[in-house]
A protein has these predicted regions:
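A glycosyltransferase accessory/donor-loop signature
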Residues: 1-21, 35, 41, 51-58, ...
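A short, conserved beta-strand element in the Rossmann-like catalytic core
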Residues: 16, 96-99
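Short, acidic, metal-binding catalytic loop of nucleotide-sugar glycosyltransferases
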Residues: 24-35
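Short loop/helix-cap segments at secondary-structure boundaries that form the rim of catalytic
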Residues: 45-53, 105-109, 125-126, 219-221
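Small-molecule pocket liners
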Residues: 74-75, 112-113, 129-133, 206
Length: 248
């Protein structure tokens, strides 16, 4: 690996995540790299984002209204040219913890154009979870070319963006399983032990993703919001203080 600058990409649009998520992603990334790193954030609202982040405005290409706040909106990153990006770029969602060095994500099979975390709820189905993926800018234009003519048709056919991308690309490569974990699916003890044991962080974990509920702050406090009271019988998490050690 050369001393060339590494690029981490995050995307923030809508109101689900505030600027503090971008700022913490920047801080966590900088603590967990030994190389020059530039953090790029594409957003529709740069308010409050720390000045060290390379902020770019989210392109406003024509989309059906129901897709404007859907993950499919990030398909623009698969165009031939994307302002501020080049080479192999590591994309991270905002609802995750960086708990170990991210340099290995750039070093892992660098000749490949796309590497992704395997989706924790679909093992063996060749579907990635696009909260964590690395891609070569400009090399995957067939994703954009397939999406752009009829976005709604792709959404209706595949329902979510990660299935669409992985099925469009065909056979995909996954990062080592122990690097990318789901808090909910990998770390919370199975019922009924989740009522008695707090989640622990494996030593080889580099990324912990918080897909769905609980959110990062809720998991720290030991809260798991539910919409139906009977779900409290099994949806439970103990307070998990190690989250706060990284989420800063």
């Amino acid at each position: 690996m050369s001393s060339q600058e590494q690029i981490l990409l995050c995307l923030k649009w809508g109101t689900r995540y505030g600027s503090e998520y971008v700022n913490r992603t920047y801080s966590m990334a900088m603590r967990n790299t030994s190389r020059p790193l530039r953090v790029v954030c594409y957003t529709d609202d740069p308010t409050g984002i720390r000045p060290e982040v390379d902020v770019r405005m989210m392109p406003d290409f024509d989309l059906p209204e129901r897709m404007r706040f859907h993950p499919f909106r990030r398909m623009f990153i698969f165009q031939k040219e994307v302002e501020g990006l080049g080479g192999n770029v590591l994309h991270l969602d905002l609802d995750l913890l960086i708990t170990g060095s991210i340099d290995a994500f750039f070093d892992y099979k660098p000749e490949l154009d796309f590497v992704v975390a395997e989706n924790w709820t679909q093992p063996g189905q060749r579907i990635g979870n696009m909260s964590v993926f690395r891609y070569r800018v400009g090399a995957l234009t067939k994703v954009w070319d397939r999406f752009r003519p009829d976005p709604m048709a792709m959404m209706d056919l595949y329902r979510n963006s990660q299935t669409f991308v992985c099925r469009t690309l065909g056979d995909v490569e996954f990062f080592p399983e122990e690097w990318c974990l789901s808090f909910k699916h990998s770390l919370i003890p199975r019922w009924p032990m989740n009522f008695f044991k707090a989640p622990t962080l494996p030593k080889d974990a580099r990324i912990v993703a918080f897909t769905g509920k609980p959110d990062i702050d809720e998991a720290t406090r030991g809260e798991w919001p539910v919409t139906k009271p009977w779900k409290k019988l099994y949806k439970h998490v103990r307070p998990t203080p190690w989250i706060a050690e990284h989420w800063k």
